[in-house]
From Swiss-Prot:
GO terms for biological process: error-free translesion synthesis. InterPro entries: ApaG_domain, ApaG_sf, Uncharacterised_ApaG. This is Protein ApaG. Signal peptide: none annotated. Residues 13-137 form the ApaG domain. Pfam families: DUF525.
Length: 140
């Protein structure tokens, strides 16, 4: 995993085989209600195929940990209602969100991919921090 700093959010990066996954989390203050225990995080994911074969993202698995170290596992088909196909040197980008009951947490996971030849493999999604600036960090 590699972490890069951007102008207003950090970028987290992981590479599995020839697939690069970058995540850019941001706090959605206007959609959050801290007084009701709702902290909404938006995250943009970029998936790049640097390989020589076409791959299709068929499933996702997330591990979400809140500030009290409670873990929630989420699995499903594709991402944002799609099973994107990435040809060599193509990329796919999507935006999703994650509500937390605490001002800090973390997410990590994996995508299941399949090649045109039918080979299945998992691609790591880098662990990334969901931490409201100024909030006490309870993870780690």
């Amino acid at each position: 995993m590699r972490r890069r700093r951007g102008s207003d959010s950090a970028a987290y990066e992981a590479r599995t085989r020839d697939i690069v996954v970058r995540v850019f989390p941001t706090y959605a203050a206007e959609e959050s209600s801290p007084e009701q225990g709702l902290y909404l995080w938006s995250y943009t994911v970029e998936i790049e195929n640097h390989g020589e074969e076409t791959v299709t993202l068929i499933a996702r698995r997330w591990t979400i940990t809140d500030g009290f170290n409670r873990v929630n596992e989420v699995e499903g088909s594709g991402v944002v209602g799609e099973q994107p196909e990435l040809k060599p040197r193509e990329a796919f980008r999507y935006v999703s969100n994650c509500p937390l009951p605490t001002p800090s947490g973390a997410m990590r996971g994996s995508y299941q991919m399949v090649t045109d030849a039918g080979d299945l493999f998992d691609v790591a999604i880098p662990e990334f921090s969901l931490h409201l600036p100024g909030a006490a960090m309870k993870l780690n």
